[in-house]
Amino acid sequence: MVHYTNVPQAGTGAQMLFSYVETCYACGVLPGVDFGSVRLNLDAYSSEVKAAATEFGVEEAVVRAIIHAESAFRPNAVSHAGAQGLMQLMPPTAARFGVSDSYDAGQNIRGGVQYLAWLLKRFNGDLTLAAAGYNAGEGAVDRHGGVPPYSETQYYVKRVAQLADRYRGAQATTQ
């Protein structure tokens, strides 16, 4: 998907018509991806995922599920809303968790997992609510007393749960 803007490029005064190419393949409500059979990625960013998962006490399978659902392991992914990198951090969230470069895989994964751990703690270990908060914001989960009634978020929590289960199974067979 190509997006256009009328915002001048910084320092040039020129108008830039091409803004960015959206790279989040699974961001839509019905992205056309079968998450029950899509190929899993157990190898990409192994050391970064393991380090952050260990540091913040989050299952590696859940971290991989979020990365897979958010960016399909593409470090330069950008969403229509402006979320960036592997774990699709919004700039304020990235700043909140000490990420200065959202396109740096190590920083993005560490910040994303730290945020996910914070959400899991806030929602008493409930992955469904934490995933909903990751997608729609914790405030939306609070306002709606659970998973918000947004189609994107409803599908997102199902994707994450399905992918997490598949990553758990795949990791169990490789250990």
Region locations from a protein language model:
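Catalytic glycan-binding domains that act on GlcNAc-containing polysaccharides
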Residues: 13, 17-20, 25-175
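A short acidic/small-residue loop/turn micro-motif
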Residues: 8-11
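N-terminal propeptides/low-complexity segments immediately following signal peptides
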Residues: 1-5
